[in-house]
Structure formats: C-alpha cells, structure tokens
C-alpha cells in the first residue's frame, strides 16, 4: 500500500482534474480520460486507488493530526500541581448532587432523621480531628484545645461538624454550594452567641475561595464530601492551596469495593432506607490507595488511614482496622518548597484500586457483630 501523503495528494489531483473536466465547455466529457491528466508511467498505480481506501486513509490522517496537536497542547499547558494556576472555570460541584441535598436542607438537625448517621459519626470524627491537630502544636488551652486555629469545613451542610469544632475553640469557616444548607446552618448557630462569633458560613464552592484564601487555614475538613465531587484531583489541589505549610487535611469517605456497593447503596438506600435513594454514586467512591496516590502527588503526606463501621441497629460508629466500607484519612501539607514529583506515584493507578476492591475479608463480619 502507498504512503498516506502520496495517496492523498494524488487522489486530490485526480478528483480535481475530473471536476475541472466536467465544468469545462471546451473539453468533451466523453473524451476525458486519465491519460489526459497523468503521464502513462503514473497510470499503473493511480488506477489502483479505490474510493474506500482514499476515504479510510483521509480519516486516519485527520485523527492522527488531531490527537497529535491535542497532546502537544496538553504538554504545553501542564505544570506541577502545586504551581499550576487555578482556573475557576473548572468546578468540583455536581449539580445533580446539589438537587438531592437541597430537598433535604431542612432536615439536618433532626437527630433521628436521614442525617442520624452523620450526627452519630461526630463521636469518631471530632476526636479524630482534635487529637491529630494537637500533635502538631506544642501547647494548648484546657477546655479550648483548638483555640487560635483556623479551620475550613468544606461541604459543611447544616453545620453538624462545624459547630463541634467551634466549641473546641477553633475559628471555623463552613462553605457549601447549596444556599438552603447555609441558611439552616446560620439559623442553628444563632442560638449560641459564642458559636455565632467563632463560625462563619458562606454559600460557595471550594474553588471559588481559593484565590482569596491561599495558605490561610491550619486545617481543612472534607467529611463525607469527596464521594460527591466530580473532579477529585482539582478538589485536592484546592485543599493544598488554602492550607498553611504543615497544615492538616482531614477526609472521611467511602471505599470503592463490592461490599461498599452492597451495604452503602443497595442496603442503606434501597432496602433499609437509612439514607435517601440517590444520595451516593458508586462510581465516585474512592479507595484509600487511590486517594493516597492523589494526595501524595499533590504535596500532601498521608499520616493516618483508619476504617470506620456503622451499626444500623445500634446507630453507633466504631473504629476498625478494615477499610472496606468507610474510612478516615489525615494528611499533612509539607512545609518544604520542593515537593515530590507526580511521576513517582503515577504507576500506583488501577492495580492498587483492584486490590482494594478485593479486600472484603472476614474481618468485616467480625466488626459488624460488635
């Protein structure tokens, strides 16, 4: 077969000559032959060109051209994640998820309602945040251990976690893209004058406040949030940018395993009705291995990953060594200027995620019996 460039140019000349022949009034179309267009030594291979071959090669050439320039543009715009300028045109907010939480905005503080598991989770996540933050400071004030710290609560909802952090002495900013959630949170904190001073709520997404809050917070909390965002990489990059050097990032979320699908979606949403249907999307769940890879590649060093299990019959959470369902993670932002290159973690990828999905061992059944 002839090369694509030669075939394409010769085919174009041949078709162009035919068009000019049919349009000309001086040349009789019945007498027009290929010998009038090409010398004899070229006829042997020109006549072998078939229309489908020409079209196929033209399509292949166009695709390769497009892919090549797309790759070049990507390489040209790429920068290291911690130095890449952020664009607010990229969003982490899923509008469909917003509709789900908008319908439930008035039920945040019903401790026996759909958010009962989140109320109960405070028994684990508040001490988890407090204890890990205290390891980063030399001294603290009794009764107000987080006094002097500034914390960002991303996806704060009605303020279920924001208020306990404020009671520990921290200055907390809670953000949520659903305005009705923020109104509920503001109304609830207004009953406590102390919290009213320590807590501030804003209706916005994380990426919308990055520009004005670079290296502002001692800690960023994203509890039960990352399984709802549409761009986890961008989300983690924003967390990195708003953290002070040596700042802490706290995440609680759901592992991406077959067990988490069976219990977190099928049982919890469709059978038991513990949470409303459509609250979670299994494709957005993230394994600890994948989350750690994203964190490390964006300048955040993972310190702790620990499993959590919820007993729907008792309504209580407890810690577990097994991370097949829910888990909590704590990462620190490095204070060094030079960060680890993303290439070091690029090979972790899918292999680790597949291993995580197979980690539904017998320890889960033992923990669920407790």
From Swiss-Prot:
EC number: 2.1.1.64, 2.1.1.-, 2.1.1.114
Positions of post-translational N6-acetyllysine modification: 144, 150, 197
Major localization listed first in the record, in broad terms: mitochondrion
InterPro entries, per database record: SAM-dependent_MTases_sf, UbiG_MeTrfase
Binding site for S-adenosyl-L-methionine: 125, 155, 176, 223
A biological process from GO: methylation
An example Gene Ontology molecular-function term: polyprenyldihydroxybenzoate methyltransferase activity
UniProt keywords, alphabetically: Acetylation, Magnesium, Membrane, Metal-binding, Methyltransferase, Mitochondrion, Mitochondrion inner membrane, S-adenosyl-L-methionine, Transferase, Transit peptide, Ubiquinone biosynthesis
Catalytically driven reaction(s): 3,4-dihydroxy-5-(all-trans-decaprenyl)benzoate + S-adenosyl-L-methionine = 4-hydroxy-3-methoxy-5-(all-trans-decaprenyl)benzoate + S-adenosyl-L-homocysteine + H(+); a 3-demethylubiquinone + S-adenosyl-L-methionine = a ubiquinone + S-adenosyl-L-homocysteine; 3-demethylubiquinol-10 + S-adenosyl-L-methionine = ubiquinol-10 + S-adenosyl-L-homocysteine + H(+)
Sequence positions that bind Mg(2+): 224, 227-228
Membrane topology: Peripheral membrane protein
Annotated GO CC locations: extrinsic component of mitochondrial inner membrane; mitochondrion
CDD domains linked: AdoMet_MTases (cd02440)
Subunit: Component of a multi-subunit COQ enzyme complex, composed of at least COQ3, COQ4, COQ5, COQ6, COQ7 and COQ9.
Descriptive protein name: Ubiquinone biosynthesis O-methyltransferase, mitochondrial
Gene symbol of the encoding locus: COQ3
């Amino acid at each position: 077969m002839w090369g694509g460039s030669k075939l394409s140019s010769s085919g174009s000349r041949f078709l162009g000559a035919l068009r000019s022949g049919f349009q000309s009034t001086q040349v009789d179309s019945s007498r027009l032959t290929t010998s009038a267009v090409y010398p004899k030594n070229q006829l042997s291979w020109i006549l072998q060109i078939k229309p489908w071959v020409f079209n196929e090669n033209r399509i292949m050439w166009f695709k390769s051209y497009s892919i090549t320039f797309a790759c070049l543009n990507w390489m040209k715009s790429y920068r290291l994640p911690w130095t890449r300028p952020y664009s607010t045109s990229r969003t982490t907010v899923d509008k469909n998820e917003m509709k789900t939480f908008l319908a439930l905005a008035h039920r945040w503080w019903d401790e026996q309602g759909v958010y009962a598991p989140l109320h109960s989770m405070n028994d684990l996540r508040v001490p988890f945040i407090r204890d890990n933050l205290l390891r980063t400071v030399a001294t603290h004030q009794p009764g107000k251990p987080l006094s002097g710290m500034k914390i960002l609560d991303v996806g704060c909802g009605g303020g279920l976690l924001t208020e306990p952090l404020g009671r520990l002495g921290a200055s907390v900013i809670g953000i949520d893209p659903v305005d009705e959630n923020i109104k509920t949170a503001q109304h609830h904190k207004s009953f406590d004058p102390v919290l009213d001073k320590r807590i501030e709520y804003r209706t916005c997404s994380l990426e919308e406040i990055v520009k004005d809050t670079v290296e502002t917070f001692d800690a960023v909390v994203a509890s039960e949030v990352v399984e709802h965002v549409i761009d986890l990489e961008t989300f983690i990059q924003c967390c990195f940018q708003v953290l002070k050097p040596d700042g802490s990032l706290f995440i609680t979320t759901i592992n991406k395993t077959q067990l988490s699908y069976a219990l977190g979606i099928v049982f919890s949403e469709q059978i038991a009705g513990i949470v409303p249907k459509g609250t979670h999307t299994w494709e957005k769940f993230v394994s600890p291995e994948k989350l750690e890879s994203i964190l490390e590649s964006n300048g955040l060093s993972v310190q702790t990953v620990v499993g959590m299990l919820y007993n729907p019959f008792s309504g209580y959470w407890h810690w577990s060594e097994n991370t097949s369902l829910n888990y909590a993670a704590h990462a620190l932002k490095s204070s060094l200027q030079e960060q680890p290159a993303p290439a070091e973690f690029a090979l972790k990828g899918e292999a680790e995620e597949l291993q995580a999905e197979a980690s539904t061992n017998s320890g889960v059944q033992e923990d669920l019996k407790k």
